[in-house]
Design a protein with these regions (language model features):
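N-terminal subdomain of lithium-sensitive/metallo-dependent phosphomonoesterases centered on the IMPase/IPPase/PAP
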Residues: 11-101
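Short glycine-aspartate micro-motif
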Residues: 95-97, 117, 129
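Glycine-rich, Arg-bearing micro-motifs that act as flexible, cationic patches
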Residues: 108
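Conserved structural elements of the adenylate-forming
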Residues: 111-115
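Acidic beta-strand-loop-alpha-helix segment within the catalytic core
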Residues: 119-170
Length: 170
C-alpha cells in the first residue's frame, strides 16, 4: 500500500525511461555540461558550503538546468540534488539523484576531471544512470541492464555508441 501520492513498481519506472527519454536525458546532461564549460573557460566563482566543500557558479547553473528539465519530463518523480535543500531520503521510494558537477575541486584546478551525474533511484537502488564528461563529450549510461558509452555531438545527439562489457556481481 502506498502512503505517498504516487507509487511505481520498478517495471513501471523502467518503462518510463523509454528510448526517446534516454536521448532527452543525455541532451539535458549535455546542455548542463555546456554551461559548465562556458563558466570553466571564463570566470569561476566559489563559495564554501556548511560541509566545508566548495560550490561554484557552475554547480549552481548546471543544477538549475538539470532540475528544471527533468521536472518537465518526469513531474511525478522528485528530484534530489547535492546543490538543493537537504531532503530525508527515507521518505522517498523513487527519486532522481543529481550531482550537477561531480568533481568540483578538479573543476577549480581546471584539470578536466569532472562529470555531470544523473541517476534514478528506486527502493534504494540505482536503476538508470548517466555520467557525462563535458570536457570530451563522452557519456556513459545504463539501459535494459546493459552499460553503454558514446560520444555526444554538438547538437546533443549520440554517436559511436557501444556496449560496455561488465562483470556480473556475485
Amino acid at each position: 500500500r502506498c502512503r505517498v501520492t504516487f507509487c511505481f513498481s520498478i517495471y513501471h519506472i523502467v518503462m518510463f525511461i523509454e528510448e526517446k527519454k534516454i536521448d532527452e536525458l543525455i541532451k539535458i546532461s549535455h546542455i548542463a555540461g555546456n554551461e559548465i564549460l562556458r563558466i570553466y573557460n571564463t570566470k569561476i566563482t566559489k563559495k564554501i558550503k556548511k560541509d566545508r566543500s566548495p560550490v561554484t557558479n557552475a554547480d549552481i547553473a548546471a543544477n538549475k538546468i538539470i532540475c528544471r528539465e527533468i521536472r518537465k519530463l518526469y513531474p511525478e518523480i522528485p528530484v534530489i540534488s547535492e546543490e538543493s535543500k537537504k531532503v530525508d531520503l527515507r521518505k522517498r521510494k523513487t527519486f532522481w539523484l543529481i550531482d550537477p558537477l561531480d568533481g568540483t575541486k578538479e573543476f577549480l584546478k581546471r584539470n578536466g576531471e569532472f562529470t555531470v551525474n544523473i541517476a534514478l533511484i528506486t527502493n534504494k537502488k540505482p536503476i538508470f544512470g548517466i555520467i557525462y564528461m563535458p570536457i570530451n563529450s563522452i557519456v556513459y549510461f545504463t539501459k535494459n541492464k546493459k552499460s553503454y558509452s558514446g560520444k555526444v555531438k554538438s547538437n546533443g545527439t549520440l554517436s559511436k555508441v557501444k556496449v560496455i562489457k561488465t562483470k556480473k556481481r556475485k
